[in-house]
Swiss-Prot record:
One of its GO terms (biological process) is protein localization to chromatin. Belongs to the MCM family. This is DNA helicase MCM8. Component of the MCM8-MCM9 complex, a complex involved in the repair of double-stranded DNA breaks (DBSs) and DNA interstrand cross-links (ICLs) by homologous recombination (HR). Required for DNA resection by the MRE11-RAD50-NBN/NBS1 (MRN) complex by recruiting the MRN complex to the repair site and by promoting the complex nuclease activity. Probably by regulating the localization of the MNR complex, indirectly regulates the recruitment of downstream effector RAD51 to DNA damage sites including DBSs and ICLs. The MCM8-MCM9 complex is dispensable for DNA replication and S phase progression. One of its GO terms (cellular component) is chromosome. One of its GO terms (molecular function) is MutSbeta complex binding. Gene3D superfamilies: 2.20.28.10, Nucleic acid-binding proteins, P-loop containing nucleotide triphosphate hydrolases. Residues 395-602 form the MCM domain. Its EC number is 3.6.4.12. InterPro entries: AAA+_ATPase, MCM, MCM8/REC_WHD, MCM_dom, MCM_lid, MCM_OB, NA-bd_OB-fold, P-loop_NTPase. ATP binds at residues 447-454. It is found in: Nucleus; Chromosome.
Amino acid sequence: MSGAYRGRGFGRGRFQSWKRGRGGGNFSGRWRERENRVDLNEASGKHASAQASQPLLQQSTLDQFIPYKGWKLYFSEVYSNNSPFIEKIQAFEKFFTRHIDLYDKDEIERKGSILVDFKELTKADEITNLIPDIENALRDAPEKTLACMGLAIHQVLTKDLERHAAELQAQEGLSNGGETMVNVPHIYARVYNYEPLTHLKNIRATCYGKYISIRGTVVRVSNIKPLCTNMAFQCAACGEIQSFPLPDGKYTLPTKCPVPACRGRSFAPLRSSPLTVTLDWQLIKIQELMSDAQREAGRIPRTIECELVHDLVDSCVPGDTVTVTGIVKVSNSEEGSRNKNDKCMFLLYIEANSVSNSKGPKAQTAEDGCKHGTLMEFSLKDLYAIREIQAEENLLKLVVNSLCPVIFGHELVKAGLTLALFGGSQKYADDKNRIPIRGDPHVLIVGDPGLGKSQMLQAACNVAPRGVYVCGNTTTSSGLTVTLSKDSSSGDFALEAGALVLGDQGICGIDEFDKMGNQHQALLEAMEQQSISLAKAGVVCSLPARTSIIAAANPVGGHYNKARTVSENLKMGSALLSRFDLVFILLDTPNEQHDHLLSEHVIAIRAGKQKAVSSATVTRVLSQDSNTSVLEVVSEKPLSERLKVAPGEQTDPIPHQLLRKYIGYARQYVHPRLSTDAAQALQDFYLELRKQSQRVGSSPITTRQLESLIRLTEARARLELREEATREDAEDIIEIMKHSMLGTYSDEFGNLDFERSQHGSGMSNRSTAKRFISALNSIAERTYNNIFQYHQLRQIAKELNIQVADFENFIGSLNDQGYLLKKGPKIYQLQTM
C-alpha cells in the first residue's frame, strides 16, 4: 500500500503538485521513486561501484546510506559524515524545526522556495551557538551556506510529511509494512532583510562570489526564457544516458561515458528526456536610486544586471523600486568579439537570491509578502524627529518656509508645491471593478523669467522622497514615457522606463515646460489615468506612472501678457492645461516695499547670513475693486498672511533630509478622509463658482476643479498627519484656489472675466470682437451704410463699454481676420453684411 502515498505527501492536498513539473522545468522524471532509479541503472548495466566514483551523476545507489534524502539536490560532493557542512545543516534544521509552524507549507509548495529573515536568523540561539560567524559564512561562501539552508528545510519538510502520512495511515488502519517514501523537490532558501546595503559604486572585482544586497530602480526587464540546468546526454557508442549538470546555464559536453568499459567520447543531447531540467530565467537591469544621497552629479547613473530564476521571475516591472539580494558573478563582456584580447574582459552581474518589491503592482506578491520592503525605512531617531515636527504649532508655515528658503515671497505658490509633495489619497486603487481616481495633484507655475520658478522646482524634487527632474527642451517623448528597445544579443524587445515611470509614486519636475514641442501629448494619459500605454512593434502593454507633475514655464515673448489667456501665453492646448490642479501666475510688477525687502534678502543670502531665510513681509495688494465675486471674498486672517514670517521673527527651517523623511512617512502611513464640514465647504465653493460662470454664459468650471479641491484638502490634512480633513483645511485650500484663479481669470485691467476660459481655449478677446462686429452689422443695416470712420468705430466701442488695451491694434486684428476692409486713411468697410 505504500505506492498509494509515494510522492504525494499524505493525501490531503498538500504538496500534491510536487510530482509534476513547474517553472518550465521537467520534474516528472527527476523526482521519481528511488527504486525506479535503481531499475533504470540495472537496465543499463551500471554497477554500484562505478556509481560511487561518479559524484556528479544524479542516479546513485548511495541514497539509502545518506541520512539527508535531498543531499544530491544541493551538493555535488559524495556524502561523508566528516563533511564540514553537516554542522551547519544541523543548526539550520533546528532553526526550521522550531519555526516550521510559522511557515505556510502550501505557499512553499506553490513557489518551491521559503523566505528566511536574516535578522531572525542572526538572533536565533541555535544558529549563533553552532555557527557564530553566520554573517561571514553567508557573505563569503553564499552558495554552500544557501545549500545547507535549503537542505535543512528539505529535511524538515520531508520528516513532517512522513509523519503526517504515517498518522494518516494509522487513522485509516492501513499498514504498508515499511517506511513511507515521500519525495520533496528542490526548495530554494530566499534570504531577505540582509544588511548592509551595498551601493552600486562599491561593487568591484573584490565583490566576486560575495553575497550582497542592493536597492535600485528597475529600468529594463527582459522576456522570460527557459534555462537548462541539467541536460541528458546519450553516449553514441553504448547508448548510455547520463544527466550532466550545466553550471550557470553554460552548455558543456561530458568528457567521458560513465560506463567503465566504454570509451565513447561523442554524446548527443536529449532535450526531451525526463532527466533534462529547465527553469524560468529572466534578466533585469537595476539603476541606482535617483534620490540616493550617495549619487554624484555630472555622471550617468550606474546600472547592474540581475538574473532571476524559478519563482523570482515576473516579480517586478520597469519603474519599481526593488531590493535585490544575491551573489556577484561574472560573465564575458562580448562573446563574439573580433578582438581576442576582449576574451579576458568580464562584466559583473548578480545572481538574485531574493527580490523585495517596494512598490508597484507586484508589491503585494513580491518575495517580501509582508511588505518589509517599504519605500522608506525609518529609524527610532527619525520617528522621534517626525513626532517633534508634528508637534509644531504652525506646521504649515514651518514646512512652507523650509521648502525653498532662498526664494523670497511666493508663500501661496510654495504652499501649492508643498501640497503636491504630500498628495491626496488614491481611491479604488485595488478595486478591479472600478476605475481608480488619482490622488496626486499637478501644479503649473507660469511667469516672467528671473522669479525663481526653476529653483522652487528643484527644491521640490530634492525634498521629495522620490523625485525626478528633467528639462523640457532636452527631453524626448520616449524619454518621458517608456522606450521599446531591441536587445542586440538576443534580438528580443525590452522596455526601458522614462522619467514619468521612474518617478512613480513620487514627483516629476519638468522645467522649461513651454519648450517641449510635441512632447505635450505624451503627458495627457499619464496626468489623468496615471499610466502609460505602449503599442509598438507588436508589443501592447501599460506601465504605472502614479506621479505628481510640477512644471514651470515661461510665456511666449519673455513677458506674461494679461490681455491673453494662459493658453495663448504658453502656446499650449486646453486638454493639457485642464489637468493641472493649480496654475500660478507670477508677475514681476514694480512695488517699492516689495523691491526693498527683496533686495535686502538677496544681499543677505549672498553674504551668508542666517536670517536670510526670512521670506517674510511681502504685502500683496490686489487691485480688484468689486466685491461681487466669490474669488475676492477673503477671511479675517488670510492664509497668505499666516504663512509670512513677521519682521524680526527667527525661523529654523527643517533640513531637506529630515523633511524628506517626514513627507515619506506621511505618504506611507497617513490616508486622510474628508469630514462632513469640509465636504460641505468645498461643495458650497464649487456651486458658487458654477453659478457665477453660468451667469456670464460660459462654463470653465468643471468637476475637475472639485476633484482638485478634494485632493488638495486631503494633502493639507496629511501634512499634519491627520486622518480626517477638517473645515479649516478646506478653507485654506479654497484660498489657495482663489489665488490661482485670480491670476488665470483676471484680464489686463485686473477685472475678473469668466468668459476667459481658465484653460485658455480660444482667443481672449474673441467674444469682444463678436459683440463689436454684431453692433456694426446692426448699425449698417439700419443706416444702409457699411463705411465707418475710425472715430465712429471708437465711439461705438465706447457706447458698448468695450475696453481693450490698444484700440488701434484691436481694429487691426479685425482687419487681418477679414471683418473690416481698410478703404483709405482711417476709413474701414464692414465685410460681414
